[in-house]
Amino acid sequence: MENLAYAIGYYRKKKGYSQEQLAERVGISRQHLASIEARGMNRGLSLELLFNISTVLDVEPYMLLKFKIEP
């Protein structure tokens, strides 16, 4: 899940959105989004929310799930 957390943050920043802006567009609180993006997140992420985030960020869901962190 750590790569997913990084992927969401990466694509959010690439789109120029703050956490507040993305959270508002997706329909969750900024705190919820922050917990999703947190390293080693323990908060669950539904498929519906994953699809909503990927739609707003204009990326395919698999791109979030297959995201690779370069050393």
Segments predicted by a language model, with ranges:
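A short, Lys/Arg-rich alpha-helix, primarily the initiator
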Residues: 1-14
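Conserved hydrophobic/aromatic packing and binding residues within compact polymer-binding modules
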Residues: 8, 22-23, 33-36, 64
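Alpha-helical residues within the helix-turn-helix
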Residues: 13, 24, 55
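Recognition helix of helix-turn-helix/homeodomain-like DNA-binding domains
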Residues: 28-43
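Short, basic-rich loop-to-helix N-cap that marks the start of a DNA-contacting helix
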Residues: 40-55
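Short C-terminal boundary/hinge segments that cap the last helix of small helical domains
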Residues: 58-71
